[in-house]
Amino acid sequence: MSEVSRDENMRGTSDGIGSQAQFLESELDTEFVVETFIEAIKDDDLKVVKEVVESGAIDINKDCIDELPGLHWACIKNRFSIAKFLIRRGANVNQTAGPERATALHWAARYGHVYIVDLLLKHGANPTLIDGQGLNILHFSVYSSNIMLVVYVLYFVVSNNNNVDIDSRDYNNRTPLLWAAYQGDFLTVELLLKFGATVALTDNRGFNALHCALVGGDQRAICDLILSGANFYERNNQKQDCFDLAKGMGTKALFEQALQHHGYDKLGNQKDKIFKKNSHSQLMIFLSPFALMIYTYLISLILSPPLAIALSLLVIVVTVNSLKKFVLPSLTRKNIYKVSLVRTPFFSGLFMSTFSFLLFIWVKKLYPYSVFDYTAKDAQLLITSLFTFVLFLKLVRSDPGCLKMDDSTTPVRETINQLIQIGKYDRNNFCVETLERKPLRSKYSLFSGALVARFNHYCPWVYNDIGLKNHKLFMFFAFSVQYEMFLFMWLCLEYFKKTNHIYEQVEEYAKCTFLKNETLCKGSNYDPSTFFLFIWISMNFVWLGGMLIVQCFQIFKGITSPELYALIKEERKAEALNLIPFENPIFSIPNGKNRDTVPEDPNATTVTHTISIDSLEPRNRRHAILDACFSMVGLNQWVVTFKEMLGISNLLRGNSQPRHNHSLLRNFLVANHWKTNLTDFWLNSDVTAPLWQRFFYSSDTSKAMLGGVEVDYYQLYELPAREGEPISSN
């Protein structure tokens, strides 16, 4: 057949069912029919596929082109409807094809298509078959880097008596753990280790899992393997141990950091722990800020302010580095792979030391000279301090709303099956860390090691997560601290005005070089210790004030900090791509490594775009780095909040005309009227209780108000509808 006539017939296949039937009735060569059939599968043209199969023009078990049959191509291209149709029409799900003699199940697993894998297994696909390289379904699942598929295979194949070993080897003796470590896929590494994968096994090159992780270059995977007892000194066939390999692969710094985090020196020798008990290490870290406060106070009494500041900063740096080097290695690593001072009681100790020193200065210096003139302010400071202390203790010990984990296998299988049936088996609806269905607005916390309902943020000042059950308590605490700092600053300023009368000085106080305010100048010269505390309190007052504005704005809008971060992220992507942000950006897929594949259908979700910093222009790259720094201290939230409050989101970007006529939050999924949002947050769901009790008491259950309706946040899988709208779900 000529190429021209073939092209004409090919064009005829797109003219509808009638023209296709006419095409099939004509006497065309089998190769062209097969070619048309395969192209229809690749293009997801179910009508053409059905027409070809139902006409009998092709045998679906003998339809190979490029050595792969139609079912294989449907699995490769994630054509769920076509694969389902072909299986129902009798396609052999265990047919091997291609140079490596792989089955359709192997191809579906290789590309991470969870729903196709589930379809094939439920229709008799044999998970124990291997391809020409000795790879089975578990190897291919790991290779896909789709953690959702790995979870599925581990629960429905490996642990379901299907004779697929967690340590199954390919013809190069590589286990799934070796593959995952080599790819730097820490989620898969952690999951395989949880299922009992053996760390000590090596491949034909003599590489163990830690060798592979050093090649992969993911620090969390390296840390997981170190914690699991990987051998640092084992040599591969090239006589390289982990230290040699790390040096050659450029991952030496990562390896040394991982060793340090887990109590080893740079040579891999176990360092002696200063504290044998974890509680002793935490107590030492908590008390260290008290020592710093006392030192700063004493040194300010005997040295000039500039010298006192310099020495204080030096001691702070030495103390922090000493804690990192000697005390942090003594801490038990339970839920986090990398311990930093932020995840220790250091900042809660810093808060308490500041709080204690504030009261000390007030009692020793401020109160004696304000008791008669400002009795009311002193009384308020005392009451607020007591209130703050009680709230602090309650917050440290509070439950943020952690969901209880169920480690048994059966509920996990049931949950996965349920999510697959409703088309929601993905990272947005299933937590791979706790292996349970993820309620809306919940988030996994590394600190708590659990899903936290209506998670807001981790607060180092109270050494706890802030979520459903303690968020209102946290707001009371923050307002109390802010008012206490305001009272202290006010009393300090009044005290500074009297310092030249309080302290007998022969000469008038020295002129200030930088401080032009007479009151502050008196304070810095006559009482440096109180002045230093005043400056420290003032800095915290400004920072906490900004945080309170952001928190109040979020409460006003009915969103949480992670949801605001997601909105900021999507807004930046939209700005870079000249797109409108998603109407539901909270539940977008974060990146390619954690991707989830769902069946192709008309209701498929929008693809999330990703942008690499390396691909940006130098100017934009600098902006990206600054944005990352701002996000660490919450400045990005401040900026977005003020922009939204003032309605100048587009003008601040330099655009005279907005690209889209809605604010960042207008299409937020759970946006309700501001009055509803306020009552949802400040009043618990017990409508039978008095109003004052609903306001001051947080609920100790998982139930709370959302959109004016009581919901169970532990079982929140659908959002209450906004007024005049249908119910939304994730």
UniProtKB/Swiss-Prot annotation:
- The UniProt transmembrane annotation reads 283-303, 309-328, 344-364, 376-396, 473-493, 530-550
Q: Which reaction does it catalyse?
A: L-cysteinyl-[protein] + hexadecanoyl-CoA = S-hexadecanoyl-L-cysteinyl-[protein] + CoA
Keyword NADP attributed: no
Q: Where are the ANK repeats?
A: 32-62, 66-95, 100-129, 133-166, 172-201, 205-234
Provide the topology term for how it sits in the membrane: Multi-pass membrane protein
| Isomerase keyword on record | no
Q: Gene3D superfamilies annotated for this entry?
A: Ankyrin repeat-containing domain
InterPro entries (UniProt xref): Ankyrin_rpt, Ankyrin_rpt-contain_sf, Palmitoyltrfase_DHHC
Q: What keywords would UniProt list here?
A: Acyltransferase, ANK repeat, Lipoprotein, Membrane, Palmitate, Repeat, Transferase, Transmembrane, Transmembrane helix
**Pfam families per UniProt:** Ank_2, DHHC
Where does it live in the cell?
Answer: Membrane
The active-site annotation reads 459 (s-palmitoyl cysteine intermediate)
PROSITE patterns linked: ANK_REP_REGION (PS50297), ANK_REPEAT (PS50088), DHHC (PS50216)
- Show where the DHHC domain sits: 429-479
The entry's cellular-component GO terms read: membrane
Q: What is known of its domains?
A: The DHHC domain is required for palmitoyltransferase activity.
The UniProt entry's sequence similarity note says:
Belongs to the DHHC palmitoyltransferase family. AKR/ZDHHC17 subfamily.
This one is known as Probable palmitoyltransferase AKR2
Q: Which gene encodes it?
A: AKR2
